[in-house]
Amino acid sequence: MSHGQPPPGSSMYGFGAMGMGSGMGSGMGSGMGTGMGTGMGTGMSASQMTSDPQDMMSLLDTSVFPGFDGMSMSLDVGDSMSNPFTPVSVPPPLPAGNAGPSHVGVCGGHGAPDQLFSPDDLIATSMSSAGPMIATPTTTTSGPSGGPSSGGGSTLTEFTKRRNWPAKVVEELQDWEHILDANGRIKHVSPSVEPLTGYKPPEIIDLFLRDLIHPDDVGVFTAELNEAIATGSQLRLFYRFRKKDGNWTIFETVGHAHIAAAKFAPNPQNQSPFCQAVFMMARPYPTKNAGLLDSFLEHKIENERLKRRIAELRREEQEEQEESHRTWRMSQEGRSDVTPSDDTATQMGMTPFYIPMNAQADVMMPPPSQPASSLNIALTRENLEGIAGSRPDSIREKMLRYEGNHADTIEMLTGLKYQEGERSHGITTGNASPTLIKGDAGIAIPLDRDPRTGEKKKKIKVAEEYVCTDCGTLDSPEWRKGPSGPKTLCNACGLRWAKKEKKKNANNNNNGGGIGGHNDIHTPMGDHMG
């Protein structure tokens, strides 16, 4: 196949019908197939051209162009001049409803934006002298919902086909991404460094990162960085960073060293792998969610500690109560062996352990006139307390000594006024039993006991609480009927509302009687008020 000037045809200066095709960047015609794309197809109407919103040629009116005849415009001399060339029509673009907006590509295809072309399309474009060539437009098929089908690739695939997509990902990161050299000098930072630290990227480039770290954390940072470079392991540390305004913020940093081969070393004499850069990613610590979690854990730990402390105090209190009951039982058993003279001596204010010999001889036998029931007087609570109080280090003293400490501890831990409770009354009255007060014959009388226990309690009528729907008052000598029902208005508002309703009813009666209509008998609202 030779390429030269074609011989003159039968209608050399004639022009046939020519329509504007769907691809401006695709070429100038299907007959001029010199690698310029699919061409401007024949027979395309203006309505078909305007169906593609991305087609720039759709703005032109085809009526101003005269038609071309069927002359062969191919550069191939092998074509017969007697047989006119039949143009190949380009398929019309997809309707707007079946496919999304398309873009005219280099090869005349309607593909996705920033779509890469296959090698076949590039070869077809470069072959400008290969004779007439019709490039097939590449279109992205769509599924029933109008989106790309499974064969067209996912959204992630389309995104990764775009130019500089890794840089776009880095720009959207909220964490601070920075690259250091082997000496710890900052070589690159992400745009997120400004909202986190206040520094703009040009201000922090070529600075040593250790110069911006708190002096107490520089040693840890240097050690971790050197270890990551030497071993190739991942580093993770926390350090305090000085922001532009002078304040300190804590960063949680992770990173790793990039170990390059020896052939990439700037020194040709280097024959071993070397650290080319250190990639690091930092974020503020703690974050908002981490701060909330830490606060919750702190409160949880404090709550558990208080629960354990309260359980210990209750256990100690229970042990002391058991000890007091045990001592009381032992005293009761000892009282059963006491002679009547001991009881009489106890009545006189002397304990049975310290009765003088002369007093014991005088009261050894009670007089016949004394009833035997008088021995029960020694079993009163006052006498028992006197016996317990006369002993050294009695239970009462132990309770006074320990309970004060417990109350102070509980008040300190819980903030509760523990000493204003029931136990404080028992301690201040000097009784061994904190829940009791002085009574008669050992009968315990609680503090909140009703003195009229023998009388039958009458049922107390609980006063109902009402609120006025008009003025909102809660105190009224009498509650009256209102528009919302009985006892919804106070005395003043109820009288005012009743007068208003009475006047309104009177006016309605007068108006109805003047027209000659119907007179209703209305009962005054005051008669229905409670």
From Swiss-Prot:
* Annotated segments matching region 7 X 4 AA repeats of G-[SAT]-G-M: 9-44
GO cellular component terms?
A: nucleus
**Induction data:** By blue light.
Q: Which InterPro entries match?
A: PAS, PAS-like_dom_sf, PAS_fold_3, Znf_GATA, Znf_NHR/GATA
* Biased composition regions of type Gly residues, renumbered to the chain: 144-154
Where does the record place it?
Answer: Nucleus
* Assembly, per entry: Heterodimer of wc-1 and wc-2 (Potential). Binds to DNA.
Q: What is this protein called?
A: White collar 2 protein
Taxon lineage: Eukaryota, Fungi, Dikarya, Ascomycota, Pezizomycotina
